[in-house]
Amino acid sequence: MNMRRGIPAEWRRAWSELVLRARQTVADGLVVGTSGNLSVRVGDAILVTPSGVPYDQLRPRDLLAVDRRGRPRAGTLAPTSELPLHLAIYDSTDAAAVVHTHALHATAVSTLVDELPPIHYMTAALGGPVRVAPYATYGSEELAAHTREALRDRTACLLRNHGTIAHGTTLRQAYEHTAQLEWMCHLWLTATSSRTHTPALLSRADLEAVSAKLAAYGQS
């Protein structure tokens, strides 16, 4: 498809933001090389990062879009191998954006526990204690199914021996959920490194109280 004609302006704007956020994952140390992937839903189309292309090389002409079943809508590059993962999330949630990374501390935690203990009140911002989806080969329908279950009533989860996945109503929110999860994993690893103390954890009631406050958070 001609990138100067026939591409909606809304898609072009969304692609620009997608590329900026993709580059931010590298700058913030959440991915290495071409690992990780991002997508954003625009109407009935999903814009997604391509497979194996360094984010600093992505240009407007590289815009890549598929439909909700993964069929090509625009672009000539192959989509990320994790497309099934993204499609599963859009199919099972109201997500408008998805961010997948190989963040160091989060990936380390994914090898240690089945659920990230509620060590910080911002656990509530992700819907509750963050689950770890069982390991499955990247890009597989099995991994997509495990992730769908781990994300039930959550906006982020860990992928065993793999990384993180988070979604949001905007790309910015999905990225913030990703960064928050990586920070909490770093916090948990730091706290559990003590040989003399055990980290204090929050109760369900604690998290419910925070959820209520977060619902009214921000400027009116």
Residues covered by each model-derived region:
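Glycine-rich flexible loops
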Residues: 1-220
